[in-house]
Each structure stands twice: as structure tokens, then as C-alpha cells.
Amino acid sequence: MILIMQKKNLWLHLLGLVILTLLSAYAVVKYPINLGLDLKGGVEFLLEPDFSVAIEREYEDLARNLREKLSKFNVLEVYATKEGVIIELLDKKEVENIKKVIQDINPNVIFEEEGDKLVVKFTQKYVEQLKEDIVRQSIEIIRDRIDKLGVTQPVVTRVGKYRILVDLPGFLDVERAKKIIGSTASLELKLVIDVSTDRKELEKKLTPDREILPSRDGREWFLVEKAPVITGQDLKTAYVGVDNLGQPAVNFELKGEAAEKFGKFTEQNIGKRLAIVLDRKVVSAPVIRSKISDRGQITGNFTAQEARDLALILRTGSLPSPLKFLQEKIVGPSLGKDAIEQGIKAGILAIILLAVVLIARYKTAGITANISIFLNVLFLLASMAFLGATLTLPGIAGIILNMGIAVDSNVLIFERVKEELRLGNTVSKAIELGFKRTLSAVWDTHVTLLVASVILFQFGSGPVKGFATTLALGTIASFISNVYYAKVFLDLLNSLKILKI
């Protein structure tokens, strides 16, 4: 009766194994595994935000607020520089009261007095927080832009303290990628004071609240108000359209409060020119003919592709600061193909060598080891396909390493079974004791590998993450196939009286 129950349980386990194997094979076929940059080809960028621009912009915003707040004091001028905000004093006795007003606006400042000037600077802690926010926002915006490009399984991750790594598998248009990722898309609408082809002429009219910007083609210079009327943050949406001449353009719509503000501004400045500034260049400067409220158009001799890309960038928002491209790497599809072929060859060779050694050493038990290793790899690939994980060249190395770990576990179990047989136990008892007495060692090995994989994934990047992913999934698959299904196969061979070990 007990023997019948044991055989029934054995066949139930085998049925479960067959179902799991078929489901795994279906997952691999139904959900093709995503290939990484090193296998599929594509581009990789290493970026770093230019913090100086963002910090200078913060100083300009602070100076703009202070001009209004300090109007009741004897202050000659308030203007921003790269190092801080300069306040020129007419009466030094008011300096303490001025400091209190400034700290009410932003408490994260320090003061330096230089003669009749008060220099306002951000604290180091505040600057570090600004940098942290800039990196975080940049990563979010880059991800959003890349998602809208339709790139499969892109990688946008932080490297070190302030750098950003971007992998675009299968995307080989480097210039377009750099333009979309690196464009700050800093859209500003500013009132034009004067225009000239001679910059020096405009410099005579410069004041702290004005600036000179070049046209998109570099032929003209525009003297404009520093303070923008509208910025990219005020946009509700942006989409491709055509101008009066039928050329590609970008239409935009404004949010509620911004639309109301823009309507008042245009109504008060009819007949004047409004500069549309994109990334510090004037793309167009139309004359305000009438009141404009919630929508506008950006023209500038764009191609259809340029207009689409600009609309995409404006919809995702402007970067908090320009990005510096520290490194770029292009992996051609041919190199990726070679890497796949080499990886497949290495894997096949490893499987053949393992199969030969195991069968030579453990006879029919070696066959069960080979089957469990095959299932290990199948379960691993099915897990990657189902989870949408990306396979990289280091990931293939992780798969091969997992095969070695699986062999190690099988050898440990088989040697223990042989030892139990030498002690005079029956084959069934030897199998039972062999697995039971090696379980703790096999468990410790797999848990240690899993912990190491998690640490590598958490703190690694790029290739290291690919290796860690396959190692972690492979470790779980290895434990299931070696500890559970290897025993099922040994019991099956024993019940059929063909087990040799």
C-alpha cells in the first residue's frame, strides 16, 4: 500500500514537472527575451548636469524677488552673478534689516559684506540639495523622453553621486538621441527691447535686468528683458502644426493662470516684439498684433522631424540644467550579433562538456543531473522572459556560472548518496538520506549567492546589473531543479530499476 502511494506521488510530481516545463517553454517562445546594448547594438551615454547654470538661475530668481522686496530700502542696485546676488547699498545702517528680509525669502543663505556691497550666497548644504534635486529631475525627464521615443528596454540609471548612464538598445541615430536627451528645452517668452546685427550696439543699452541673446542662425542679436513672461513650466501641451506658409511648426497651449497672465501682457504690449527663446537662442520674434491668451506657435524653419522632436521635448518638460556628454559609445548590430554567437557557442560547449563529465562519472544518475541543469536554464530563461528582464553578455556569463553551481550541487548530493550506499543502506534510503544530509550545505550556497546577487544589482550598474539579474534568477531556478526535481528523477530511475551511480 505504501509502495503504491509512493509511486502515485512520484507520478504526480512528474506531471507537475511536465506542466511547469511546458509553461516555461511557452513563456520563452511567447515573450522573447529583451537583448541588452552589448547584444542588440545601440548607443550609450554618460552624462553629468552642468550645475553652474542651474545655480546661476536660482540666483537670478532670488535677485528678481529681492528687487521688489527691497524697494523700500536705500538700495542702489540688486543683480545676480554666478557667485551670488550683489546688493549695492546706499545706507549701510540698513544692512541688518535687509538681511532679515532676505532670510524670510530664503533662509538657506549666508552673507558677505564687501564695502558698500552685500553679497548673498547659498549655503553649501542648500547647494548640495539643489544638485541632488537636479540629478533626480534630470533622470525622470530623460526617462520620459526616451519612453516617448519607443525604445525597448532603455536603461537610465544613476552612476556615482552626480552622473547618469543612458543605454538605448537598438537605437543607432546618435545625433537625434543626443538632441532629444541633451536639449534643456528651456522655453521662455521675453519682451524684446531692441534688435541689431551688431552686439556692441546693444551692449550700450544693457542693464542688470536685461540680457543679449543670439538668433537661432546667429545673424542677429536681441536685447530682451531677463524676466520671462512665460516659461516651459507654463505649458499645458505642445504638438506639431504648420505656420502660415505651410511649414512645420510647434503649437502650444498654456495652463489657466499662465494664459490669464499672458493675455494681460500681450494686451499691454501690442505693437512690440515678443522673443520666443529656446535653449538661450531666439527662434522667432513676432510682433504682438492683438491680445493672445491660451495658445501660441513656435516657428523657425523646422524640418518635420525637428518639429516632432521639439514638441516631444516640450511635452516632457525642460531639464533643470544643461547636460554634459562625458562619454558616448556606439555598439553596432554586427558587434552585437558576434557577441550573441560567441555566447551561444560558449554555452553549447559548456553544456556538452558538463554532460560528458557527469555521465562518465555518475552513469545514469549523471543523466538526471543533465536534465536538472537543462530545466535550471529553461526556468531561468522563462523567468527573464516573463519579468521582462534584459539579457546582456555578462548575463550569459551568469547563466554559465549557474550551470557550474548546479553541477556542484549535484556532485555534492551524488557523492553523499554513494557514501550512504557504502554504509549498507538501500538505494531508496540512500537517496533519501543523501538529499536530507546535503540540504543545509546546498541551501547555504544558494542563499549566499542570492544575497551577493542582490548586492551587485543594488550597487552595480550596466553590465554588473545584467550579471546580477541572471545570477539571482538562476540561483532560485537552480535550487528548485537540483533539490526537488533531481530527487524526483533519481526516484524514477530507481523505481524503473535502472539507476546506476
From Swiss-Prot:
InterPro entries: SecD, SecD/SecF_arch_bac, SecD/SecF_CS, SecD_1st, SecD_SecF_C, SecD_SecF_C_bact, SecDF_P1_head. It is a multi-pass membrane protein. The chain crosses the membrane at residues 9-29, 339-359, 371-391, 394-414, 447-467, 470-490. GO terms for cellular component: plasma membrane. It is found in: Cell inner membrane. The keyword Cell membrane applies. Part of the Sec protein translocase complex. Interacts with the SecYEG preprotein conducting channel. SecDF uses the proton motive force (PMF) to complete protein translocation after the ATP-dependent function of SecA. Forms a complex with SecF. Part of the essential Sec protein translocation apparatus which comprises SecA, SecYEG and auxiliary proteins SecDF. Other proteins may also be involved. This is Protein translocase subunit SecD.
